[in-house]
Amino acid sequence: MSSIALGVNIDHIATLRNARNVDYPCIIEVANIAVNNGADFITVHLREDRRHIMDDDVFRLKSSLKVPLNLEIAATDEMLSIAIEVKPKCVCLVPEKRQELTTEGGLDVGSIFSYLVSFIEKLHSYDIDVTLFIEPDISQIDLAKKLHANNVELHTGKYCNNATQNELSKIIKAAEHCHHQNITCHAGHGLNYQSAATIAKVPYISALNIGHFLICEAVLHGIGKSIYKMKQVIASTD
């Protein structure tokens, strides 16, 4: 079996729930189904505008999950306070714009480097691992290393939207550089069965984060079957 871990993002279960302001589908139940069908960890993005995941969702997931919780947040004081209270296994810092439909790209680490120094130190002081969601760019990885980030997650959106050898080469080179810098390398955004199979073959990538596609597949085939199939797809890359 592949050593690639599968993180399942369940944000859009909350989107469906919030469309009618009801308490179903139950995000805890979906998370448990995901885990029972191969999810190695659960990812949620608590956005500043609370458009899908709510604060209570995060606390409930943390208290009930038998696998690690990966909490995506913007690097703000409000989110830092919530993360410290929740104490997830890992916090993934992502850029955020209120008008965007989804995260549009990686962090510009250099532009907020000084701010991130104390932000990351604070998370580490509570034994929370830190991931930086970045473009597959060598300079961003070097900055992540200086910040003592535990992991980076390479933004695969550009490759998924334009599956050229050039875009894939950027990811391959970035993952190799992470290895040389002793930073754990994850990848995610826009992945489907086909693109996930390709990215899972990239040396030194240890985890994939996949959400929207799996939730869409769940409409047709069920959440359990969709996650199980994805797990088999990335496992078959050995």
Swiss-Prot record:
What GO CC terms are in its UniProt record? cytosol
Q: Which residues form the active site?
A: H45, E72, H189
Site feature (Transition state stabilizer) residues: E153
The EC code for this enzyme is 2.6.99.2
Record keywords, A-Z: Cytoplasm, Pyridoxine biosynthesis, Transferase
Enumerate the catalysed reactions: 3-amino-2-oxopropyl phosphate + 1-deoxy-D-xylulose 5-phosphate = pyridoxine 5'-phosphate + phosphate + 2 H2O + H(+)
In this chain, 3-amino-2-oxopropyl phosphate is annotated as bound at N9, R20, G190, G211, H212
Name the positions where 1-deoxy-D-xylulose 5-phosphate binds. D11, H12, R47, H52, T102
Q: Name one GO biological process term.
A: pyridoxine biosynthetic process
Spell out the Pfam families in the cross-references. Answer: PdxJ (PF03740)
Q: Subunit structure, briefly?
A: Homooctamer; tetramer of dimers.
Family indicated by similarity:
Belongs to the PNP synthase family.
Query: What role is this protein assigned?
Result: Catalyzes the complicated ring closure reaction between the two acyclic compounds 1-deoxy-D-xylulose-5-phosphate (DXP) and 3-amino-2-oxopropyl phosphate (1-amino-acetone-3-phosphate or AAP) to form pyridoxine 5'-phosphate (PNP) and inorganic phosphate.
Q: What is this protein called?
A: Pyridoxine 5'-phosphate synthase
